[in-house]
Amino acid sequence: MRKSLLAILAVSSLVFSSASFAADLEDNMETLNDNLKVVEKADNAAQVKDALTKMRAAALDAQKATPPKLEDKSPDSPEMKDFRHGFDILVGQIDDALKLANEGKVKEAQAAAEQLKTTRNSYHKKYR
């Protein structure tokens, strides 16, 4: 009886930990989306830098996750490698926009951030 109870607890903890992991990916996606809106509406470099910095952290964290569509794939599968590569592209684009924001070029940073939407849309089609 005790072994059965321990087995049930072990399995349920794995189920709940994977569910919370998926929520983390969802939270990171929400952070990316919310802060992209901030970048688009910002009127000063400080707002843009703050939003882009939050986006960068969320993208790096999300890159470690596995989307529900790829849960049956191994971490080194071509699909998972492509999923992570999408975040490499996204982080590079965020860094480009952040560089412009650090130079006080708000409009240019906002224009550079528009590329994020193209990347988002492309990878959402594949993995969402």
UniProtKB/Swiss-Prot annotation:
Highest taxon in the source lineage: Bacteria
Gene: cybC
Keyword Cell membrane in record: no
Cofactor: heme b
Pfam families in alphabetical order: Cytochrom_B562 (PF07361)
Binding-site residues for heme b, renumbered to this chain: 29, 124
Subunit structure: Monomer.
Entry keyword set: Electron transport, Heme, Iron, Metal-binding, Periplasm, Signal, Transport
Organism per entry: Escherichia coli O157:H7
Biological process terms in GO annotation: electron transport chain
Family the UniProt entry places it in: Belongs to the cytochrome b562 family.
Main location: periplasm
Function: Electron-transport protein of unknown function.
GO molecular function, one term: iron ion binding
Signal peptide: 1-22
GO cellular component, one term: periplasmic space
Cofactor mode of binding and number, as noted: Binds 1 heme b (iron(II)-protoporphyrin IX) group per molecule.
The protein's name in its UniProt record: Soluble cytochrome b562
Subcellular location: Periplasm
